[in-house]
Regions:
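Membrane-interface extramembranous regions at the lipid-water interface
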Residues: 1-45, 52-91, 95-134, 150-178
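Extracellular/periplasmic helix-loop-helix junctions in multi-pass membrane proteins
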Residues: 134-147
């Protein structure tokens, strides 16, 4: 029997590097503008900081897309979320708050089915992603980006462990989708 070849999982080190670069850019930005802006002014980041924040957000969406590409190529598994849908629903206001809990739940369904016990906790991923978005938009974009990729590291780790298991026997079909 030939080993299972799936598309590769996302390279998360790129996200961590972008997060670290964003934190460094924030520190440089802060040291260049030591005085506080007037409370009526909206702080506008420098171009290099904005580009790092933008590229970090885009790379996060690339990683989400990649997870769902991998899930769609698993033999015997019908993943209910297309890669485009997984990314697209992040842009719908209010619904995206639900979505960051929903797509990890579907990946956890696969992981828990492969282990035949609840190994992956999708609520934890959803809470980490939600906390990362709050951190990213209200407090610190760089640390928020690093927190996003910590959540992705948990997902990748669970998927790697599930892929390392021997193939499932045909008598144990996957659970139906909701």
């Amino acid at each position: 029997m030939q080993p299972l070849t799936l598309p590769p999982l996302p390279q998360l080190w790129v996200g961590y590097l972008l997060g670290l670069a964003t934190v460094v850019a924030e520190l440089i930005e802060g040291s260049n503008h030591a005085s506080d802006p007037p409370p009526t002014d909206f702080p506008i980041p420098n171009l290099y900081l904005f580009l790092l924040m933008f590229v970090g957000a885009v790379y996060w969406l690339v990683c989400v897309y990649r997870y769902h590409v991998v899930m769609g190529h698993i033999p015997g598994w019908k993943h209910p979320i297309s890669p485009a849908r997984a990314v697209g629903f992040h842009f719908i206001p209010i619904y995206n708050l639900y979505w960051v809990f929903k797509w990890p739940q579907e990946i956890a369904r696969f992981v828990n089915w492969r282990f035949a016990q609840p190994v992956m906790k999708p609520q934890m991923v959803g809470l980490m992603v939600f906390a990362a978005f709050v951190m990213r938009f209200l407090f610190d974009p760089g640390l928020g980006l690093i927190l996003l990729f910590l959540a992705a590291s948990y997902v990748s780790g669970c998927l790697r462990r599930a892929f390392a298991l021997p193939p499932m026997p045909p008598k144990n079909p996957p659970p139906p989708t909701e």
